[in-house]
UniProtKB/Swiss-Prot annotation:
NCBIfam families: PRK10154.1. Keywords: Signal. It comes from Escherichia coli O7:K1 (strain IAI39 / ExPEC). The keyword Signal applies. InterPro entries: UPF0412_YaaI (IPR020240). This is UPF0412 protein YaaI. HAMAP family: UPF0412. Belongs to the UPF0412 family. Residues 1-23 form the signal peptide.
Length: 134
């Protein structure tokens, strides 16, 4: 009876350690300052090409309005993918996950992400934080 209890306790502890040891793969890819006037050439270049399966956008400071976004992959043909993003993000808000690499080609790595948009309702520049998940 004692050995059954010991075995059960050991399994429970190992399960807890197993689950707490797993780290999420969310990484802050970068932050972009959004100008007050509409701009279509805001780019976040990743210094190290990395596989990113989805991203989240957060308005860290100020409200912002987005009119487009695209992901560029390191490939022989400079492949890219347009992203379906919300048109407005309020300060402190985070979007749902936005999937990229939709063709299931997980070998492609992201070299840059571009945005079109601007700050709204503020005299200061809003900041857009990009979080990636691999």
């Amino acid at each position: 009876m004692k050995s059954v209890f010991t075995l059960s306790a050991s399994l429970a502890i190992s399960l807890l350690l197993c689950c707490t040891a797993q780290a999420n793969n969310h990484k802050i890819l970068g932050v972009i300052a959004m100008p007050r006037n509409e701009t279509n050439d805001l780019a976040l270049k990743l210094p190290v090409c990395r596989i990113v399966k989805r991203i989240q956008l957060t308005a860290d400071h100020g409200d912002l309005q987005l009119s487009g976004a695209a992901v560029y992959f390191k490939a022989a043909r400079s492949a890219s993918q347009s992203l379906n993003i919300p048109s407005e993000i309020k300060e402190g808000q985070t979007t749902d996950w936005i999937n990229i690499n939709s063709d299931n080609d997980n070998k492609r790595c992201v070299s840059k992400i571009t945005f079109s948009g601007h700050t709204v309702n503020s005299s200061d520049m809003a900041t857009l934080k990009i979080i990636g998940d691999d």
